[in-house]
Amino acid sequence: MTAIDTVRKCQTAGLKLIAGEKKENVEHLEPYGFTSAAQNGAEAVVLFPGGDRSHGVAVVVADRRFRLKGLARGEVALYDDQGQSVTLTRAGIVINGGGKPVIFTNATKARFEMPIESTGDIRDNCDSSGKTMAEMRTTYNGHT
């Protein structure tokens, strides 16, 4: 891939083909519910229906530079070039934020129907004068 346009209804890409042939505005068909904007250098499988080289269609775009390795049979992952991923492992779901925040938005609530464990602090009202659970325990313990 040499270029990408994610604004159109059907994403299009600029591609350099095997013999160095360049193609612009090649439609990239994506599976329903999934979309991505691949980095330059990603690889594509392009079909030319009826052998018509004037209208290619990229049916698969992959980038082996960033592909997660070592998945067990049956495991599935969603990933990017920054180390962020969601992996459906045989033991459970693993979300790797790649060192960035994980933000949930536009929901009426978050409900967890299981025990919650944290190795870090839990803070309430984090955008105002919230306190961590540890700070609240210190305040509470001082009253007893």
Region roles according to the model:
Residues A42-V46, T138-T144:
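Extracellular disulfide-bonded cysteine-rich modules/repeats
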Residues G41, L78, T87-L88, I93-T132, ...:
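Low-complexity, small-hydrophobic/phenylalanine-enriched stretches
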